[in-house]
């Protein structure tokens, strides 16, 4: 079957491109050209029937990925579906199922059956569970797992094909070594076998499988820095050069490509990292994990990384992989998913505003106008997380009459600056009254930059419990 890239190169605007154009408020021909040039991807496996197509590229609204998945000690299929529902509810544009234990096939196929957003995987995780030791992996097993997951409907796969044997000595002086799970597994395999990375050696065979199902390849950064001390080092950039080569090889097979990036990077190096990737990989969409801008805040790494993610997106990164408060500490639950997504939706939206995306600031202006008008219900309705906003307000002023009040508990009646400003404008002749001017219904913004958060067509998920906090229920009353 033909891939989105092959269709685009042939001049065909597909149904998926039409849907993307609608969601992005862009011309369908522009979408087609971006895909044809490899500057954007539409991850859309032919077998993912529940998918509502979306696009990832620097010329479009910044997207956010949420990692879900279990580990051997924790979480089963039902809990993972609840995480999926939570992720979509709070605005994930894609999800990655990173499960490493339990019934992997059931978890994966259930996620794909219910998910309206693209589902990504890291196939080497399943491959490792099918052998006694990682050193027992074979190229044939890796190809078999990739093909099986493609048949199941996976939309994009992370393949750490750029970690080469000659790169490994470059990590010797690092502080935290190789922190990518896939990268470390392959490094050990190469060391024990004295052979080259099998994902690199069999990359053309892998691309043939991916093209058959239109699976987008996400070229993994197996040598990404896991600490500020290791950022922008020789190992990271040697792998990046290989990823540039692999990008062009995948394109030759008609496979859509995005490239993954760090990691942990000081703030002043982030823009240079993004620009380098865009140059080396010929503009293929950059998909970054954070990056974290400091290593001192375990428990708050959704914040340390969202700071870096904002800068990365401002510089041209196309998709941000969220980090939850549990990063480096444990497996996230549904509430951690909520917190991580809030941080990253803020990062993505802030970058889109900074980059002047059409209509992106309209949402901000509408909230500000509702705030100035003391229209509390409208503020809650427009908020990124309506339940959280209403809950915080009602903790101190719970009665309904306070929804009409011209103050909150921060300043009280006498010291509310906006109330004082309004009174001054009404009393004198020197200042005119202020009026609301923003019409979100006519905004040129992409869907992800307009409320409500979580705008995917998700009818199938209605059958799955969503473990949202009680304050969400209150906000909907």
Swiss-Prot record:
Q: Which family does it belong to?
A: Belongs to the ThiC family.
Residues where Zn(2+) binds: 264, 328
Put simply, this protein is called Phosphomethylpyrimidine synthase
Gene symbol here is thiC
> Under which pathway is this protein filed?
Cofactor biosynthesis; thiamine diphosphate biosynthesis
Q: How is the cofactor bound?
A: Binds 1 [4Fe-4S] cluster per subunit. The cluster is coordinated with 3 cysteines and an exchangeable S-adenosyl-L-methionine.
What does the record give as the function of this protein?
A: Catalyzes the synthesis of the hydroxymethylpyrimidine phosphate (HMP-P) moiety of thiamine from aminoimidazole ribotide (AIR) in a radical S-adenosyl-L-methionine (SAM)-dependent reaction.
For this protein, the record's InterPro entries field holds: ThiC, ThiC/Bza_core_dom, ThiC/BzaA/B
EC number(s) in its UniProt entry?
A: 4.1.99.17
Segments carrying the region annotation (Disordered) are 427-477
Task: Write down the chemical reaction(s) this protein catalyses.
Answer: 5-amino-1-(5-phospho-beta-D-ribosyl)imidazole + S-adenosyl-L-methionine = 4-amino-2-methyl-5-(phosphooxymethyl)pyrimidine + CO + 5'-deoxyadenosine + formate + L-methionine + 3 H(+)
Which species does the entry assign this protein to? Natronomonas pharaonis (strain ATCC 35678 / DSM 2160 / CIP 103997 / JCM 8858 / NBRC 14720 / NCIMB 2260 / Gabara)
């Amino acid at each position: 079957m033909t891939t989105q890239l092959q269709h685009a190169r042939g001049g065909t605007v597909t149904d998926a491109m039409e849907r993307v154009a609608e969601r992005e408020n862009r011309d369908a021909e522009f979408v087609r050209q971006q895909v044809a040039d490899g500057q954007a991807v539409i991850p859309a496996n032919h077998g993912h029937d529940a998918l509502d197509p979306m696009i990832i590229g620097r010329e479009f609204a910044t997207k956010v990925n949420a990692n879900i998945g279990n580990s051997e000690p924790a979480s089963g299929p039902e809990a993972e579906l609840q995480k999926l529902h939570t992720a979509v509810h709070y605005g994930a544009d894609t999800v990655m199922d990173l499960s490493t234990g339990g019934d992997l096939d059931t978890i994966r196929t259930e996620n794909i059956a219910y998910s309206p957003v693209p589902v990504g995987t890291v196939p080497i995780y399943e491959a490792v569970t099918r052998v006694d030791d990682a050193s027992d992996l074979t190229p044939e097993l890796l190809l078999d797992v990739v093909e099986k997951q493609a048949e199941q409907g996976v939309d994009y796969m992370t393949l750490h094909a750029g970690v080469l044997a000659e790169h490994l000595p470059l990590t010797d002086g690092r502080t935290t070594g190789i922190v990518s799970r896939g990268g470390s597994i392959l490094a050990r395999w190469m060391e024990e076998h004295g052979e080259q990375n099998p994902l690199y050696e069999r990359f053309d065979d892998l691309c043939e499988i991916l093209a058959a199902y239109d699976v987008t390849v996400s070229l993994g950064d197996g040598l990404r820095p896991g600490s500020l001390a290791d950022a922008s080092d020789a190992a990271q950039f040697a792998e990046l050069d290989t990823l540039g080569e692999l990008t062009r090889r995948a394109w030759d097979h008609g496979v859509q490509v995005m490239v993954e990036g760090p990691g942990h990077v000081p703030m002043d190096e982030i823009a240079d990292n993004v620009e380098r990737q865009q140059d080396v990989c010929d503009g293929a969409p950059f998909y970054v994990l954070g990056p974290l801008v400091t290593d001192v805040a375990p428990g708050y790494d959704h914040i340390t990384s969202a700071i870096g993610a904002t800068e990365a997106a401002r510089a041209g990164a196309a998709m941000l992989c969220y980090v939850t408060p549990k990063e480096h500490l444990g497996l996230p639950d549904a509430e951690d998913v909520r917190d991580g997504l809030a941080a990253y939706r803020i990062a993505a939206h802030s970058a889109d505003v900074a980059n002047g995306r059409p209509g992106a600031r309209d949402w901000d202006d509408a909230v500000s106008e509702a705030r100035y008008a003391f229209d509390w219900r409208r503020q809650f309705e427009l908020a990124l997380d309506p339940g959280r906003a209403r809950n915080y307000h009602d903790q101190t002023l719970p009665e309904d009459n306070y929804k009409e009040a011209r103050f909150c508990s921060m300043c009280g009646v006498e010291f509310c600056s906006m109330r004082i400003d309004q009174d001054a404008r009404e009393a004198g002749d020197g200042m005119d009254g202020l009026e609301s001017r923003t019409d979100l219904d006519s905004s040129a913004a992409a869907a992800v930059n307009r409320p409500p958060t979580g705008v995917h067509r998700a009818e199938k998920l209605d059958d799955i419990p969503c473990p949202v906090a009680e304050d969400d229920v209150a906000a909907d009353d």
